[in-house]
Amino acid sequence: MLDREGYRPNVGIILINERNEVFWGKRVREHSWQFPQGGIKPGESPETAMYRELYEEVGLLPQHVKIVGRTRDWLRYDVPNNWVRREWRGSYRGQKQIWYLLRLTGRDCDVNLRATRHPEFDGWRWHQYWAPVDEVIEFKRDVYLGALKELSSRFLRGMESYEDFAARQPSGNR
């Protein structure tokens, strides 16, 4: 299901622990890492889609998390044409996402990457809050930065800024 501009409605999930570290998932049989995300089905609310994706990708149930907040508006990224399925070229541009910030209220052992028959991730770790911006595939970087900035400024008081984090990193990591 695409909107008029060719974007697929989607939710992104930033799951944090008590140290404000983020869940960082390794995609199955790939060397790429990302936040959990997934499409919104017709008739499904963003919040319902978020809980479905949280279970499908991370194996967590609503009782394992607390919603801290969400982005006010859709954040969009374009997918490079060589990443788009041939049959979608010309109509599909990318994803538009509502991002949720969740706090894990359960335990690390509640995470179950094999909760469904088609796992998205085959590994995971807790990661510094801002580190994913520099590690995610390039075409998603602006959306990751926008979501992390908006959610930290609105809901995580005292969080180090991305600019301060980036200034502390070795120059080869930016």
Curated annotation (Swiss-Prot):
Keywords carried by this UniProt record: Hydrolase
Gene3D superfamilies according to UniProt: Nucleoside Triphosphate Pyrophosphohydrolase
E.C. code: 3.6.1.-
The Nudix hydrolase domain, residue ranges: 6-149
Chain positions of motif Nudix box: 38-59
The keyword Transferase is assigned to this record: no
A GO molecular-function descriptor: pyrophosphatase activity
Necessary cofactors: a divalent metal cation
Claim: Hydrolase is one of the keywords in the record: yes
CDD domains, per database record: NUDIX_Ap4A_hydrolase_plant_like
Similarity-based family: Belongs to the Nudix hydrolase family. RppH subfamily.
Function: Accelerates the degradation of transcripts by removing pyrophosphate from the 5'-end of triphosphorylated RNA, leading to a more labile monophosphorylated state that can stimulate subsequent ribonuclease cleavage.
Entry-linked HAMAP family: Nudix_RppH (MF_00298)
Protein name from the UniProt record: RNA pyrophosphohydrolase
